[in-house]
Regions:
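HIT superfamily nucleotide-processing domains
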Residues: 1-117
Length: 117
């Protein structure tokens, strides 16, 4: 069965796309820690990020870097933090979160409530 991220990539579930190329897709998180919280996923469905072959993993980080630079341009923040957790969705992904302080990358804190606008 396809992961929720594969369904998003295939357009079966709507998303707010930030960037895309032939191997990766970046979109806004539906339960963000901060405005601009973005997920970067490989189009190839791989459960565990450390099972991704070295070349694709390096390319994923380069893609994530480009997305992070764009986020930092669009969202006023000190830096863009990066996290990999991998327990909630069985499809490897990187979280990119605009940060003002270290505590902004706390996944246990309450998520933002955003409108559809």
């Amino acid at each position: 069965m396809a992961s929720i991220f594969t369904k998003i990539i295939n357009g079966e579930i709507p998303s707010y796309k930030i960037a895309e190329d032939d191997k990766f897709y970046a979109f806004l998180d539906i339960a963000p820690l901060a405005e601009g919280h973005t997920l970067v996923v490989p189009k190839q469905e791989i459960d565990y990020i450390f099972d991704i072959d070295d070349e694709l993993l390096a390319q994923m980080h380069i893609f994530a870097k480009k997305v992070a630079k764009a986020i930092q341009t669009a969202i006023p923040c000190e830096k863009v933090g990066m996290a990999v957790i991998g327990l909630d969705v069985r499809h490897a992904h990187i979280h990119l979160v605009p940060l003002q302080e270290v505590g902004d990358l706390n996944f246990a804190k309450e998520k933002l409530k955003l409108s559809d606008d």
